[in-house]
Amino acid sequence: MFFGGKGSLTYTLVIICFLTLRLAASQNCLNKSLEDVVIDIQSSLSKGIRGNEPIYTSTQEDCINSCCSTKIISGDKACNFMIFDTRKIARRPNCYLFFCPNEEACPLKPAKGLRSYRIIRDFPSLTRNLPSQELPQEDSLLPGQFSQAVTPLARHHIVYSKPTDISWRETLPQKFGSSDHLEKLFNMDKASAQLLVYKEKGHSQSSQISSDQEIAHLLPENVSVFPATVAVASPHTTSATPKPAIRLPTNASVTPSGTSQPQLATTSPPVTTVTSQPPTTLISTGFTRAVATLQAMATTAVLTTTFQAPTDLKGSLETIPFTEISNLTLNTGNVYNPTALSMSNVKSSATNKTASWEGREASPGRSSQGNVPENQYGLPFEKWLLIGSLLFGVLFLVIGLVLLGRILSESLRRKRYSRLDYLINGIYVDI
């Protein structure tokens, strides 16, 4: 047991170190894609452009990484412009690395089959822009106040993944201290929480340097948003699929006591758990289960969501699972999920939650059912067409066999010739 725990701890440390190195390497590889253009070498030589000998790389990403790590062009110049030739095959040099003093020194001209990338080296490091996020203090949770943690979004080729693991049993006792404060926090407002998840629509690759996202602009007065750290995934991705907005009403108007400890649904990872207690909302996404206090990172996951809401004063939980939620796209584009929280004073039973989800799923259900009559009518038509073709083929085969048999029977039948036939035949022979 000891060796198994030690081995898993070592394996987790190795994975974290590997991802940290990949993250550190990817932060220096911010680039701007330029399709079907190439540097005008003749006019750029007099303006200070420098370059190395072309090399062979299997993919464009390898060429970009090679440019990011190359800092010895003409002695001490760092590569900031690269060209990848997609027309080269059979391990021929296809990656060209250059150093451009400025953008005006490297004029471009159109060229089919060549992809150019401008490496942005003066972009500020993302780790310095990410503020240290702490949970709100006890005095900031008074009525009329709210705390909010805003993390700036990187402007180019960055994918944000979800936080790894947040547990109520770890966060609440450490940050808020006593059960008296929990009672004061839960009894401040008996309102319902409405969660709006906005997903950013995918943009083209040329317009990916954009302004920062607007985050959480519909916050209530008595809401505490629990921030979570943001991990940066692999760079150089192209675009993100647009996601529809989803309304997740939580119409639970109860007052749990301070001694209740809500627990997350412990299913096999990966699991996404949304635990809602008025007036606070915690969104946590668990991918893998780490050993001790280490947080494990995962690559991709098919998410299952569980909604939990307190139902009585003793802290018992009602679990309403729902399986249809917008697919979270990880490390495939510029995706960031800003969360907006709004409070309302509408009280209803927990059964309204299931009704709202059924209503939300009704529109895609109707659209999918609209295609059923076409399939039902299309299948018999194809069936009759196949039967008709088969019948026509059999009929033509029978006709051909009849004609062939008639010809064969006539050729084998012995004819009776008359004297006139012999006379005519003799005349033709004489001629």
Curated annotation (Swiss-Prot):
Parts of the chain on the Cytoplasmic side: 409-431
TM annotation in the entry: 386-408
Low complexity biased stretches: 266-279
PANTHER family: LOW-DENSITY LIPOPROTEIN RECEPTOR-RELATED PROTEIN 11 (PTHR46876), MANSC DOMAIN CONTAINING 1 (PTHR46876:SF3)
Protein name as annotated: MANSC domain-containing protein 1
Polar residues compositional bias, start-end: 250-265
Residue intervals annotated with topology Extracellular: 27-385
